[in-house]
């Protein structure tokens, strides 16, 4: 496991888990506000810190059958990497297990995995060539972290398909899934959320510009900038989620219950 999923004492793990539950619940509520979820069909997960070094790895995820706006910190379930619910009430959706558990297992840096169907990224996924153009300044940093899954039309009903998705993701953070949606990963909840938010905004600009029928202005390839610095050091990502949590604290305080 990466350093961020470190072993904690039982007391520390309990406090840390609640903090992470609140962050995850906030992301579900924010996603609902933006219409990123496909009714009850989407899922977000998070690997949890281990209370002791020999503890089996577990992850947090939304239970099957709930819309994102219904979810609260306490309603999220805890599962092991074999798909068993070990804490909480509810069922783990099989497709969620086959995608999320395999990404977590095969890519330890993917501590948080968000799988949603936001309007603009999903629209781009439906194009013959689903790609983010090098047309907006956001693309200068985003595009090197994007991979396209052009062969994901088969149902995700086993670990083999989950492994294919995980291996294709590799060290990228954004997967545009052709004719489907998007999966975004990160080392923390706030990093994955911020990455998803920026990618969807960038897709919105692209789709809006393309709707004019005019040719997109292409930025020089020499300006492409890879993300510098270790994951977890993107302070603005934490501030971004905190800002949204302040709004939720006022308008939807039950998310943190």
Can you annotate each of these PLM segments?
Residues 1-257:
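Glycine-rich flexible loops
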């Amino acid at each position: 496991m990466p350093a961020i999923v470190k072993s904690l004492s039982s007391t520390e793990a309990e406090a840390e888990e609640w903090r992470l539950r609140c962050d995850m619940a906030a992301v579900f509520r924010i996603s609902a506000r933006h219409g990123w979820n496909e009714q009850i069909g989407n899922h977000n997960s998070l690997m949890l810190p281990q209370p002791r070094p020999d503890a089996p790895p577990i992850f947090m995820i939304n239970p099957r059958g709930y819309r994102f706006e219904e979810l609260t910190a306490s309603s999220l379930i805890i599962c092991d990497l074999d798909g068993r619910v070990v804490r909480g009430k509810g069922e783990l959706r099989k497709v969620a297990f086959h995608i999320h558990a395999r990404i977590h297992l095969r890519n330890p840096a993917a501590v948080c995995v968000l799988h949603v169907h936001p309007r603009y990224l999903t629209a781009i996924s439906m194009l013959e060539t689903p790609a983010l153009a090098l047309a907006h300044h956001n693309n200068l940093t985003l595009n090197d972290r994007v991979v396209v899954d052009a062969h994901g039309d088969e149902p995700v009903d086993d670990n083999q398909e989950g492994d294919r998705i995980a291996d294709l993701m590799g060290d990228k953070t954004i997967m545009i899934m052709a004719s489907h949606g998007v999966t975004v990963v990160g080392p923390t909840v706030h990093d994955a959320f911020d990455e998803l938010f920026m990618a969807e905004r960038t897709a919105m600009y692209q789709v809006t510009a393309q709707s004019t029928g005019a040719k997109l202005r292409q930025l020089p390839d020499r300006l492409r900038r890879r993300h510098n610095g270790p994951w977890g050091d993107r302070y603005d990502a934490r501030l971004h989620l905190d800002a949204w949590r302040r709004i939720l604290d006022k308008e939807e305080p039950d998310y943190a219950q």
